[in-house]
Amino acid sequence: MRDKKLETKLRLVTLQLENWKKLHDLITYGLDKAKPIISTEQERQFTDIRANLLQEIEYVLRELGMLSEASGKAMSVLQRGVSVRGMRELSNDEVRRLETDWNSVFTKLGLMQGQLKARRKELAEQTVFDFYLNR
């Protein structure tokens, strides 16, 4: 048995997680002062990923029922990290807050993905008769 709403939510959370991972890679690169100069291409990638997250995060969190618990931290990360180059100018406290907030959002999205996958597996093992019987 398949649930279209469940599949949609799973797709949404998977895409969000991929974008949060890409954002993390660029943030980490920006914070590493030993790395070479930040390229225009890296800044463009960062801006594109950040724009995608800004456009989609509220919708995705609302669809997943996580708006109240993750929206503030997500916006904190997206507002604090305005460019890869700007990462190098953050104070140690700002970096810690950024990392903590990023981890919080990423963890919540990961947990949601795990719950959705478990529900998908549960549904896959059900027959149509079982599904309607257990409603």
Locate predicted features.
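Conserved non-transmembrane functional hotspots
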Residues: 1-135
